[in-house]
Amino acid sequence: IVENADENFGFSRYAEKLGRSANSFDELYEKLHSEKTFIDEITLELLEKKIKEIQPKLIGFSVPFPGNLYSAFRCAQFIKKNFPEIKTFMGGGFPNTELRDLKEKRVFEFFDFITLDDGELPIELLYKKICHSEQSEKSPLKRTFLLENGEVIYKNNSEKHDYKQSELGTPDYTDLPLDQYISVIEIANPMHSLWSDGRWNKLTMAHGCYWGKCTFCDISLDYIKLYEPISAKILVDRMEELIEITGENGFHFVDEAAPPALMREVALEILRRKLVVTWWTNIRFEKSFTRDLCFLLKLSGCVAVSGGLEVASDRLLKLINKGVTVEQVAKVCRNFTEAGIMVHSYLMYGYPTQTEQETIDSLEMVRQMFEMGILQSGFWHQFAMTAHSPVGLNPEEFGVIPSVKEITFANNDIEFRDKTGIDHSKFSFGLKKSLFNYMHGICFENPLQEWFEFKIPKTKINPDYIHDCLLEEENFNTKPNAKIIWTSAKPLVEFFTKSKKGNTWEMATLTFHEKTNVFSINLEKNKAIWLLETIDEIALHKNNKALNFNDLKSKYELNFDDFELFWYSKPIQTLKDNGVILCL
């Protein structure tokens, strides 16, 4: 297609290079006044048909990425030429990050309005202004650019507050031909395949990021800094509604980083309602993701998570203010993997002050994590300095020198020079080639030098570093307020008498039939009966309010002594190891 029909074609993006840090509008403007492409003709034919069918007064374009920008402008251009009475506006991720300093008047030859950040209220006010004739020309607007008296102005004069996340309702897919979309796998990366192979209902657990401190991230913008979680009940209500509307039970939670506590409550709510769903999301590699929590997430239908290991160096992770260490990331990845959840990691190189030694050491960390089987997917990208991140706002603090340009159109990615003087781009091919092999489970024994055509320093990382991180002593501490959840059906019970040295006592064998295995434990008869009676109080489907560890201990000690000896005994540990008992 690219060679013969349209050089700008891409399955998930189109003419992306025109939108990437287009500080000037000239190149895009020139392209918009050149001959229409093959893809343009198809797009505009569909657009014209829809406009004639619906006859709208106002048309909005959501532009999340640079790869959507050209097509949005081409469609808006068509509308202005053929339906000049229709008003057009643009919102979405691209204007939210790139067009906050918009000065280019020619943009308004295509769009009447550009809205920023959460779109519900800005669009509602535009609708009232355009579609209700009784509204005056001086109608208030929310975070909106427009052209007035030949000048680009920004209006934010509405006193109305943005809608709360709980008030937004469920996405409406009613008019989309969901059965006609094709699934395309562009590259062999397991997580990228998951994104595009098949269709996912999109939802958000929380607006913004609960961490909101990473120095490479746009933490000064509302979409990151305004954190507002949604209750688990509302989220699962929306999931049920979407299943009914779309007939599909796959969900992608598109959070910046889903909060672990909320993920737990969502998982419990899914299981209580006995919903059969498949879901995945983005996370931070928090120590809160214990083995038991990961097992619960798996039970609820979680199949994958993606999170940032970034530079895989403790010094740089601290500089980034990521709030994690390589060891912590390794342990969390292990917990997810053992629960049967795929782990994808975002990997970064070229962060300010990063040395060549640290880049190679990062690669060695990644190699070991794939070799240990605790990472299944990853993607290297070179650090980009964005205008709204702490690095972009305070470059001198991070040892970088920005390239200052006059900006009239897009402003996000900033060209810069690192004071180390290292050309980090030279590592790109070697990092990606090695990762491709590691994801296929091969070439772990290859010296790191083989991935690069230039001399690299030898790694200083111990070859067993990740292995040693995962060696840990048995933890005999349980939080007093930890919820105790029983996830299985009741076991089969057989009583028998055990004799030893002239003594006899009553015993019970409890046999558990799980989805993937069958196992048994032996307990003293009276303790087995107590456990069977207690199951109803801690069973997932029986009661919305599970007992916590202290409650369970008190209940046990009404009948027996030494709860800790019972709780950390081999039979009960077997139940924990098989996910029958979870401590959350």
Spell out what each predicted region is.
Residues 1-10, 416-584:
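Radical SAM enzyme core and accessory elements
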Residues 171-342:
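Radical SAM [4Fe-4S] cluster-binding motif and immediate context
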Residues 111, 275-278, 282-461:
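A structural motif corresponding to the C-terminal lobe/cap of the Radical SAM core domain
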Residues 16-164:
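Glycine-rich beta-alpha loop elements in corrinoid/cobalamin-binding modules
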Residues 1-56, 77, 81, 101-108, ...:
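Conserved Radical SAM active-site core
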Residues 66-70, 96-98, 123, 152-153, ...:
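Flexible loop/turn segments at secondary-structure boundaries
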Residues 31, 150-202, 516-520, 577, ...:
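N-terminal [4Fe-4S]-dependent radical SAM core
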